[in-house]
């Protein structure tokens, strides 16, 4: 009962201009500039985000996730040494990063009408992949570092 109501709550008001502003950094520069020029929405644009904090928090989150997965699967998957663990998590993390780029960002996000602002309905305006590719490229070293840290943690575990 809790999960369906949580899903309904998070889905509520999706596709509205205010809700779309939460993902403001994902929009192409052309869209961001149009939002800044919009009298109503420019006041609601989220404050800038410190990218160093975002990268560090992503590394911490994925190191914890990889560490938990590794601790659970250490003997099942046969992680016998650092390199086994590191390669597994490196492949897993980079595959996740690539999936996010191709499926979520390039195939879904740019083509769904839910992410469009009411005053910019043209699909063509949302097609510039630069922000998504930049995010993917930032993810490569982040996932590599998370894999490295998780592999180190697994080496310490009995």
Locations of the language-model features?
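Juxtamembrane/disordered regions of integral membrane proteins
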Residues: 1-158
């Amino acid at each position: 009962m809790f999960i369906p109501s949580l899903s309904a709550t998070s889905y509520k008001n999706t596709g509205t201009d205010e809700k779309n502003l939460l993902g403001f950094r994902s929009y192409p520069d052309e869209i961001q500039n149009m939002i800044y020029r919009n009298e109503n929405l420019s006041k609601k644009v989220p404050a800038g985000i410190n990218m160093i904090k975002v990268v560090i928090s992503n590394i911490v989150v994925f190191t914890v996730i990889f560490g938990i997965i590794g601790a659970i699967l250490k003997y099942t998957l046969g992680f016998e040494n650092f390199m086994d663990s590191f390669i597994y998590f490196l492949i897993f993390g980079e595959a996740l990063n690539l999936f996010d780029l191709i499926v979520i960002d390039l195939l879904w996000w740019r083509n769904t009408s839910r992410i469009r602002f009411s005053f910019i309905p043209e699909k063509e305006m949302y097609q510039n992949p630069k922000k998504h590719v930049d995010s993917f490229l930032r993810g490569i070293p982040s996932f590599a570092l998370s894999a490295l840290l998780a592999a180190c943690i697994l080496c310490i575990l009995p």
